[in-house]
């Protein structure tokens, strides 16, 4: 996995330097659970946290990110949380 993470880091940096608009979403461990509609999103979430999130919540975040201007040219970690998706993205 270390090789994957290094390649991912380099790809993310290349995208950031490209001049293109981007949003990089880094979800935690993906679960086969129903969505809650509530997340935690931050530039960095410590590894000692419960880093799980449902696939459905990740999909919701990806769709909302298409129209939420506050996430343009940002990268963020994403896990299950207590904040509604729209609010969490606005607060990044």
Q: Where does each model-flagged region fall?
A:
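Oxidoreductase cofactor-interface core, primarily capturing Rossmann-like NAD(P)-dependent enzymes
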Residues: 1-92
